[in-house]
């Protein structure tokens, strides 16, 4: 964690972080994979060669390379595999951004307030965080989706309720380590309000931890969404989502092997890229956080 003096707080933390990062070699392969994912997600209609939901029985089960119009082949309904993979990236990025962003916001606010105020709020929220972290993530997500029903809203809520606790725990730890510093005490004596102290003096010193946790959690969120979709607890069947595509191909994997292979490879490569980038962020910004 990078801490700053009273005069530096709020304006220097990002410069210190930048100086640390710029001297470390950027992992270009993971970065390229992440950029490719974002391009596919943001420009799916322009990048995809076909409509991912268009059915063409005459071109069903085309193997990769058998027809140049379908370089990755087609599924049992004649839908283009490449287009479905590209549109699947949009689904993955949308769910990850919304769910992880909401979970990070909730966890950060809870961690900041709990660490600064302590007392009953700290006790209640941290016991709730312990409970959330004590259960397997996939089990909690499955219970939520079963109760609410399959759909994108259920997946987002499931991810939110499984990631907020880690953010809250780590941010609270940062707050406890700096809340008694001289410049914080001086701000309290001067009558500065709690929200202003948190925003101007404490939050800037937690940004590094927030960035590291977020980068490390993206891969887990993608894997969780794919797992729920594979189990039939995610998006509706037929949607171009990677987990659903793997599930649709499992029954014919010996005959039409590419149905499960390509989305499975996409999930694996993207998750590994984000995990590697998260490790790089952790080592670059704060090697002490290697326990994450």
Question: Can you say where each PLM-predicted feature lies in the sequence?
Answer:
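Residue-level hotspots within pore-lining transmembrane alpha-helices
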Residues: 90, 101, 132, 136, ...
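Conserved polar catalytic motif of the HATPase_c/GHKL fold
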Residues: 170, 205, 209, 213, ...
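Generic hydrophobic transmembrane alpha-helix motif, especially the helices
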Residues: 71, 75, 81, 105-107, ...
């Amino acid at each position: 964690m990078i801490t700053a003096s009273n005069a530096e707080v709020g304006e220097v933390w990002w410069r210190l972080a930048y100086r640390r990062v710029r001297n470390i070699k950027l992992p270009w392969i993971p970065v390229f994979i992440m950029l490719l994912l974002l391009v596919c997600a943001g420009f799916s209609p322009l990048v995809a060669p076909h409509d991912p939901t268009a059915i063409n029985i005459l071109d069903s089960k085309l193997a990769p390379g058998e027809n140049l119009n379908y370089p990755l082949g087609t599924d049992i309904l004649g839908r283009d595999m490449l287009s479905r993979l590209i549109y699947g990236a949009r689904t993955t990025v949308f769910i990850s951004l919304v769910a992880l962003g909401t979970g990070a916001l909730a966890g950060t606010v809870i961690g900041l307030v709990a660490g600064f105020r302590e007392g009953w709020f700290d006790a209640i929220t941290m016991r709730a965080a312990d409970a959330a972290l004590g259960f397997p993530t996939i089990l909690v997500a499955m219970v939520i989706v079963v109760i609410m029903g399959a759909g994108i809203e259920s997946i987002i809520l499931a991810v939110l309720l499984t990631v907020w606790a880690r953010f809250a725990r780590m941010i609270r730890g940062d707050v406890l380590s700096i809340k008694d510093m001289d410049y914080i005490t001086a701000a309290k004596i001067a009558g500065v309000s709690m929200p202003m102290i948190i925003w101007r003096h404490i939050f800037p010193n937690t940004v590094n931890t927030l960035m590291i946790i977020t980068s490390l959690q993206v891969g887990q969120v993608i894997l969780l969404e794919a797992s729920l979709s594979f189990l039939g607890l995610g998006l509706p069947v037929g949607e171009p989502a990677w987990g659903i595509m793997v599930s649709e191909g499992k029954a014919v994997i010996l005959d039409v092997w590419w149905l499960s292979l390509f989305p499975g490879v996409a999930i694996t490569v993207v998750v590994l890229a984000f995990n590697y980038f998260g490790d790089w962020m952790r080592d670059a910004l704060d090697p002490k956080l290697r326990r994450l």
